[in-house]
Amino acid sequence: MPGKEAAVNVMQSSTKSNTKKMVQARLPFKRLNPVPKDEGCLEEKKVRITKNVSPQKMLHSLNSSMEDMENDCDMETETVPIPKAVNGKGPLDNYIRKAPKVSHAPSITTIDLTEESNISISNDCPLNGESETHLANGTLALEESTPNLPLSAKEECTVSLENKTVENTHFSELKSDQLHQAAATSTSASNFSPERVVKEDCNSSADDDSASVSSSSSPVSLSSPDAQTGSQFRNRSSPSTSTTPTGKVTANKTSADKNKTKDKDKQRQAEKEERERAKKEARSAKKKKRQGLLKNLQRKRGKTSESSGKEYKKEKKEREDKEKAEKMKLKEEKKREKLEALEAKQEEKRKKDEEKRQKEEEKRQKEEEKRLKEEEKRVKAEKAEITRFFQKPKTPQAPKTFSRSCGKFAPFEIKKGMALAPLCRIDFEPEASEELDRFLQEQNSKIYFFDEIKKRKPRKMGQTTVPTVNSFEVDDVQVLGESDPVLGSNMLEGHIKDIGVPERKKFGRMKLLQFCENHRPAYWGTCNRRSRVINSRKPWAQDTGMLDYEVDSDEEWEEEEPGESLSHSEGENDDDPKEDDEDDDGFFVPHGYLSDDEGVSDEECTDPENQKFRQKLKAKEWYELQTNGKKIRAMQPVVIGCVWWDSKASEISLLQKFSACILESPAVDEELAQEISSAQSLKDRQILSKLVPLLHGNVNGSKIMIQEFQEYCRRGLFLEDNASDAAGNESTSPNVTPQTPSNIIVPSKARLKRLISENSVYEKRPDHRMCWYVHSDVLKGLQQDNLPVPCQWTYITQVNSVAKEDNGANGGSLQSLPLSGKRKSAGSMPITKFMKRAKDLETAINTDMDGFQADNEEDDDDCMILEDQQAKDAEDSTIECKINLNDSAVLASCQN
């Protein structure tokens, strides 16, 4: 049958074309209304339904999502969870569009006319009751599912493909049995709802490959999957025919065709209902499957929740352990940082301490070096002070003088004893120069020059410079130089000439005779013999008449015997350097200083600081004496010579200061002489005879006793006692005038203190307490051996005395003291006080250094002997003015 043959040809061509490579077509336009793709929705893919496939597998394949095969030819299907229905619609509802129940379109044709596509539509693709169209060799064969459609009828249709129309396409008429068979096949397939997922071309996408084919009756939308499956065709024609199809498909409509179309419409309506029912069943099956999947998922989630709980706890525990470990790690890091910071601080502190210690060490070393330098400097200074006495003072060097540059000679130094020769030794006077000019003008040509020379004698000229003799080089006499302004220049020159050796001109110059072969010393002296043989032209000639050349003077020379060495005498030991230093130190004492044992106490001698200070003073004064020109040198006599009456005035003025003068002593008044003699006649013995009764057995200090005795003398009591002695001595010394109260003399404080220290001692004896005891020999000499102890002196001044009568029943005269100054009775005072007092007195004895044991107060240093002062005043009075010594006011002023 022609229909079957055509179908077989179509299948064969389709099988052959399947082996060809698919290339995706890229269209030059964009989609007008792109459909948004949801995650849960399946992508639009071309689906091809195959036969002999079970409905379950077809349903599974429809529910599975297809991957995009744009870059990969192999397509793999994966099972994805079915998304839930939203508003009663599933994921496939967006692709299904309900067609109207009554459709007058005789056929729905979908043709894939993509460029470079030569794939024909296979017979295995049923269109679910719709017509299947095959395009082969430029003709489009349409197979209708309605059995009543006449096969011989030709229809003219227009197929739109990307703005291109296919006209005059002749569809071959199919037989009625083929259409019925195709309709039955499609009906049976629709009852089972077979759906098969077919792999698309690797080079084409679902949206780009879909094209809308509009017929004259009703167009079909390409968005639904059913329409897509029904609109696929395989182009079996050549590429040139398939790309640009032209022509019209004509069909002759008859009554049979109309009946067929009606039947076809009915059949289509039934197929549509059947298809909707199949869709509902498929939806319910999908829903059940989805519910089962959800239950399985919940069951799995329940199982996983238990395991996840354990895992969660485990993870939580691990997380907590991890957090704890991190916290511990942070704590350890913080602790380590603190320790590092502490160590850094300690290291820094240690470095600072080390630097401080180093600075202190350096400072200490510097101080030590400074102290050592000062000590060394001090030792050197002390040594220099000691050795300075042995060193000769250095004379300042005279400044060097240089000559002026003269001609070709460079300047040279003019040393001591040198002098430059003048350019002209003759000094022309103005008269001589005028005479020379006159002779040059009035020359006489008749007189010969040689004759004039023979007539004249050669002139003599003395020394250009007169040598000066230093006074230090002459040991015999002293030269009076410029320091004495009285001397004149003539006298100085004559004096210098007289200083020389008297016979120097007679004997000539000094000569040195020395030979290297001789052992005897050289001869230095004068030799006034002159030889007639030996002269300057014959220096090696021998004068046998004057000298004996056969005698060897070396044989006659005898060495002198060494003298006695006085450096190491017997009984002397000079090995001790300390003794030498002490002797030298005591020997080199400048004038005006006392020795070590004069005027210095023991404490000052033992004190090293005072000793150093005294040595420095000595060295300083010695240095001043040396530097100020007061040098110690041997005295030299000054020889001036005889001075006559008609001598020069300079010589007379020089000796004027040595002229003799008559000294006349002035007349002294007799009264003043008597006063001086009376003062001198007052001797220590007389004073001591009146002082012993006060001194012997007295417990007071020397100062109190001196004040008491001076007051005793001022009141004239001392003179009254001496009046009888003076009257007894009138026969022997009639010139001594009796002392009256007007000429009272008070001994000085120093004199009384000296008498007390020389003639008494302050000590404690077994019979009596501590007090002053006069020496027994002094008492015998003064015939006062029976003086009581304690003393029975009646005090004139008020003195706080501690004297006490040893025996209360003794009926002697007691010391007249005020009531407040007397001691209390022994019964009213504790004995410990007396013991303490005795102890204090003993300590006073031990600590006293000057011999006045009872003195507790400092003595006045400005004390003078009264007799000397009065003598001086008397001498001044004789020169300047006359003073009446009888005046009491003058006496009071002298005493003060």
UniProtKB/Swiss-Prot annotation:
What do we know about how this protein assembles, alone or with others? Homodimer.
**Localization of this protein:** Nucleus
Source organism per entry reads Xenopus laevis
Primary residence: nucleus
Ranges of Basic residues compositional bias? 285-302
**One of the record's GO cellular component terms:** nucleus
Q: Which UniProt keywords apply?
A: Cell cycle, Chaperone, DNA damage, DNA repair, DNA replication, Nucleus
What's the protein here called?
Answer: Chromatin assembly factor 1 subunit A-A
Per the UniProt record, the lineage of the source organism begins with:
Eukaryota, Metazoa, Chordata, Craniata, Vertebrata
Is Protease given among the entry's keywords?
Answer: no
